[in-house]
C-alpha cells in the first residue's frame, strides 16, 4: 500500500452499530436475513458448526485454528486488567499492534467498536465484526482444508495477512479467516523466461515490505514495494496495482510479477504466469486481492541497488492562508519535473502545514534534486515563509528510504481518492488549490503520490486499471480517526463521500477514477472508478475461477452480488 505520510503506520458493541455503508443493496433486496443457504452461516444459526466440528477441523489443520480473542478484551468485563489495558491503548496507533494479530484490523471503522479498548470498561466485549476464527496457515494443505471446511459449512471466508486495508476486506462478522501472515519464505534466485531473464525473488504471502527490503538489500538488490514497511506484498498491494516510490523507475508492483502460486476455491493448486494459466495471471495482476484465488507466494523481479537521492520539505501555515497556499502552489508546479526526472513524491496538505516527503529519485544526483526544488525554495523565500528542506544522496533506495521516510504513528484515517492526469492538473492549478483548501478548512487532509509510468517500461499484459497508468498523481483525501468519538467519525465518513471526494471529482472529466487500494469504500459506481474498462472481463474470470462466490470483499469484482444485512451476515442479493 502506498501510504500517505500521515498514515504510513496505518498501503482501521453490537453488530448493528455499523451503518450499512458497504453496499447499495437494501434489506429488501437480500434473498434472506436468516440461516438460508442464500446467506453465509452465522453464529447462533442452527447450521453453525458445533464445538465438535471445530475441534475436528482444528485437528485436521494441525492445531492451527485460532479462536478470536480481541486485543481490547483486557479493557472489559472479567478479563479487565488496568495495566494491560493502558498498554493496549498506548500501542493502538502502531501498525505492529495489529499486523501480528490474527483478527485485528488497521481501519478502525470496520472494527465497528467491537471490544473497543476506548469504550467504558462495563461495555461488553463482543467479537462483532472480527472473524470468529482464523487458521494460522503454514502450508498449501492448510489452505485447501480451510476452503473445504468453509464451503461444507457455508461459512464466510476471509483472506487476511496484516490487516492493512481501507475497505474492511481483512475481516468479516461470522467469518473464518485464512491468516497468511506467517508464510515467510524468501528465496532469491536466477530466473529465465520469454519475458524476463535476471534476478528474482519468490516470497511467501506473509512477507512484508520492510522484511523484503532489508533482505534484498543485503544481497545488493531492490524489490518494488510501497512505503509502509508493514504492508504484505503478495496480497492486496501487488494484486491491486502496487503504487510506490519506485513506480517511475521500474513500474508498478503488479508489473514485477513473474509467477503467482495460488489455491483456487475448489482446492486446486495452480501456478499462473504470462504463458501458463495466463487469464488467471492477468486477473490476479491488478484486478484486486482476495477475489479469484488464495495466493500463497509470488515470484517478482529483483533489481540491482543503485544510487538514490531522497528529499523532504515542510513549512507551516503560520500567517496568511492566501500566502500559505501560494507556497503549496509553488510545490505543485514542480511535481511534473520530479516525475520527468524519474522520481516520485509523497506530500500532505493540512490546514496548518505542508509536509513533502519522501521525494525519491532513483539514479538521480543530489544536485539534480536540489535544482528541481530551487524554484520552490525561491518562492518560499519571496513569500517570507519559513521552511525546512533537506536532501541526500545514497548508494541505494533502501538507505535513502530509511533516511527520508521515518515511521509515523497513525492507524486511523478514513479516506477517498482520485487519480489525476498531468493535463488536468497543470491545466487547472487554481481549481485544485481551491478544492484542497476547502477540504483542509473543514478538518480534512489531502495526500498526493506523484509518479509517471512510461510505455518503455515493459511488462506482460495485466489487469491494472488503465487510468492508473495514464495519471500523474493519486490523491487520497482523509480525515483522522478519533478513537473516542464514534458519532464524529460517522459524520466525517459522510464528509468524505458527499463533499470531499466530489470536490476533486468535479475537476475531472466524467468524475475521474481512483486507485483501488486507496479510495472511498462507499464510492458510487466503484466498478468503473476502480477497475475501468477491465471490469467486465474481470467479472467473467471471477465466474470461471470462483463461480460460487467463495471469496468476497467490499468493492472486489463481483461483490455487488452479495451484501451485509443489518446484523452483518453476508447474503446473496436477489
Curated annotation (Swiss-Prot):
Keyword Transmembrane annotated: no
Enzyme's top EC category: oxidoreductase
EC number, as in UniProt: 1.-.-.-
Keywords: FAD, Flavoprotein, Glycoprotein, Oxidoreductase, Signal
Pfam families listed in its UniProt record: BBE, FAD_binding_4
Superkingdom of origin organism: Eukaryota
Keyword Transport on entry: no
Cofactor dependence: FAD
Disulfide bonds listed in the record: none
Signal peptide range in chain numbering: 1-27
Cited PROSITE patterns: FAD_PCMH
MF (Gene Ontology): FAD binding; oxidoreductase activity
Record note on disruption phenotype: Leads to the accumulation of dihydrosorbicillinol as well as to higher amounts of oxosorbicillinol.
Carbohydrate-modified residues: 58, 112, 136, 266, 312, 363, 384
Pathway: Secondary metabolite biosynthesis
Stored InterPro entries: BBE (IPR012951), FAD-bd_PCMH (IPR016166), FAD-bd_PCMH-like_sf (IPR036318), FAD-bd_PCMH_sub2 (IPR016169), FAD-linked_Oxidoreductases_BP (IPR050432), Oxid_FAD_bind_N (IPR006094)
Transmembrane segments: none
Similarity annotation: Belongs to the oxygen-dependent FAD-linked oxidoreductase family.
Role, per record: FAD-linked oxidoreductase; part of the SOR gene cluster that mediates the biosynthesis of sorbicillinoids, a diverse group of yellow secondary metabolites that restrict growth of competing pathogenic fungi but not of bacteria. Sorbicillinoids biosynthesis requires the action of two PKSs. The SOR cluster is required for the production of trichodimerol and dihydrotrichotetronin, with sor2 being sufficient for production of trichodimerol, but not dihydrotrichotetronin in the light.
Name assigned to this protein: FAD-linked oxidoreductase sor8
Lineage of source species: Eukaryota, Fungi, Dikarya, Ascomycota, Pezizomycotina
